[in-house]
Every structure is written in structure tokens, then in C-alpha cells.
């Protein structure tokens, strides 16, 4: 049970909401995404997966099995999975060995994507 998906896409405005429900946008350059991906790996976060950014809702037996930064859009391993992504995109393969999570959240479409934990990104701002 594998999920193949972009983790972060560069040079796009991404809508978010703050704690008061106010809308704002975040934006990441290719270089920033590369720094985030490397820091994520260096911090050994590959198996620290939670549900909906809830640190009290860690998901066992789900991990990033593989990830990379797209270098050539038309000649990238992500093409095999049906993607044509911008240079600088962080792409990943998530292995889901948790049958219950796969059945209840992935297969039902309740979980539609991945997001790098905000806390992790906030810590990273000190590195950039």
C-alpha cells in the first residue's frame, strides 16, 4: 500500500487559515523546499506521521519510504506515477502498513493529501 504524491510544490501560493480563521498564503521557493526536505530527513522524521496535524493522533506503521526533489520535469521518476511536476517539487512515496488507516482514511478519500507539519516548518525558519 503505497501513496505516491507531491509533498511540496515550489513557487505557488498555498492558502492557509490562522487560528482565528483568517486566510493567508504561504509560498516556498525551490531552494527553501530543498532545505526543508533535507532538514526533514536529517531530523529523522520519516516515520513521524500524524493525522490532520494533531500531535496526539500519531499514525503507526506509515512512513516516508522514499523522497526526492524533482530535477527535470519531463524525466523524473514521478512521471511513472502519472505526474508531470515543476522542477524543485519535493515528491515522496509513503508506505502504509496500517490496514485500518488505509481502509478508513486513504481508500475512503477522507485523506486527500499530505502536508509537512507546521511546527517543523516553523523550526526551519531559524535555519533559513
Feature roles, as predicted:
Residues 1-128:
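Signature of dsDNA virion morphogenesis modules
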